[in-house]
């Protein structure tokens, strides 16, 4: 059970199933928690590699291509723990990592906000279409 315990800052990497390669950064609010065998726990040395930077790096197209190329496909797609351990990670100063994370985090916030607005606009469109088609709302031309 100890090997399956996750800590804040860990990265969870799906290694089995239809979602191979999906990742998540563990936040303090979900601790204590454990994983199952379909997830790899990636724990960085925080003195040389920021978890947030590693998270952003593992989301890149470069890593996705490597994972897609190396997964074995049987009943379910799989990636081995040794393959995860062999993924390349850039060696960049903590200062540069922090700058990159700040930029990417702000882009993620804007993207999330836009997605929420799109969902809301689709809901409004659906409501308006329903009102127009049912005759509850009339349009004068």
Predicted segments with their positions:
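Residue-level recognition of specific faces of alpha-helices
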Residues: 22, 38-41, 78, 83, ...
């Amino acid at each position: 059970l100890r090997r399956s315990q996750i800590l804040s800052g860990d990265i969870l990497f799906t290694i089995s199933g239809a979602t191979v390669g999906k990742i998540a950064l563990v936040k303090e609010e979900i601790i204590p928690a454990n994983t199952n065998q379909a997830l790899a726990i990636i724990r960085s040395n925080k003195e040389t590699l920021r978890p947030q930077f590693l998270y952003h790096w593992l989301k890149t197209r470069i890593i996705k291509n490597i994972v897609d190329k190396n997964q074995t496909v049987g009943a379910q797609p799989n990636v081995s723990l040794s393959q995860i351990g062999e993924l390349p990670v850039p060696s960049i100063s903590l200062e540069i990592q922090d700058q990159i994370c700040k930029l990417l985090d702000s882009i993620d916030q804007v993207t999330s906000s836009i997605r929420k607005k799109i969902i809301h606009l689709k809901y409004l469109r659906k409501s308006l279409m329903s009102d127009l088609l049912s005759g509850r709302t009339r349009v004068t031309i």
